[in-house]
Amino acid sequence: MIGTILAVGFGGFLGAISRMLTSSFFNKIIPHDFPYGTLLVNIIGSFLMGLFFSYASSKGVHIFTKSLISTGFLSAFTTFSTFSYENLLFLQSGDYFHFFLNIILNVILCLLAVWIGFLIFK
């Protein structure tokens, strides 16, 4: 049990750092009127989650590895709380276009990404 807990913690540490670096990179190269960094991190993370679980279900990956990658790394890499906060800011500023666009893009593109990732090893 302690090994699994440490795996989740280490994976989370790496996932959070990766999210910060990836999101910051995309926010620097794409204009700031929309939270593209968060959107792209969520799409990438969703794709990787689908890819990993498709592979894991076909290859029988050990629980330690599942904990490290899915519960640890990928859960820390994607960010629903930031997505929610950015939507709150859009609502508070009356920017309903970006509010709805952000929700629609995150839900549809992340669902599509996890599905595509899953199909790769199916």
From Swiss-Prot:
Q: What is the lineage of its organism?
A: Bacteria, Pseudomonadati, Campylobacterota, Epsilonproteobacteria, Campylobacterales
What domain of life does the UniProt record list for this protein's source?
Answer: Bacteria
**One cellular component (GO) term of this entry:** plasma membrane
| NCBIfam families assigned to the protein according to its UniProt record, in alphabetical order | crcB (TIGR00494)
For this UniProt record, give its keywords in alphabetical order, as a comma-separated list.
Cell inner membrane, Cell membrane, Ion channel, Ion transport, Membrane, Transmembrane, Transmembrane helix, Transport
Q: Give one Pfam hit by family name.
A: CRCB
Q: What does this protein do?
A: Fluoride-specific ion channel. Important for reducing fluoride concentration in the cell, thus reducing its toxicity.
Spell out the family assignment given in the record's similarity comment.
Belongs to the fluoride channel Fluc/FEX (TC 1.A.43) family.
InterPro entries recorded: FluC
Q: Which residues cross the membrane?
A: 1-21, 34-54, 60-80, 100-120
One GO BP annotation of this record: cellular detoxification of fluoride
GO MF entry, a single one: fluoride channel activity
Question: What is the annotated localization of this protein?
Answer: Cell inner membrane
State what protein this is by name: Fluoride-specific ion channel FluC
Reactions that this protein is recorded to catalyse: fluoride(in) = fluoride(out)
Membrane association type: Multi-pass membrane protein
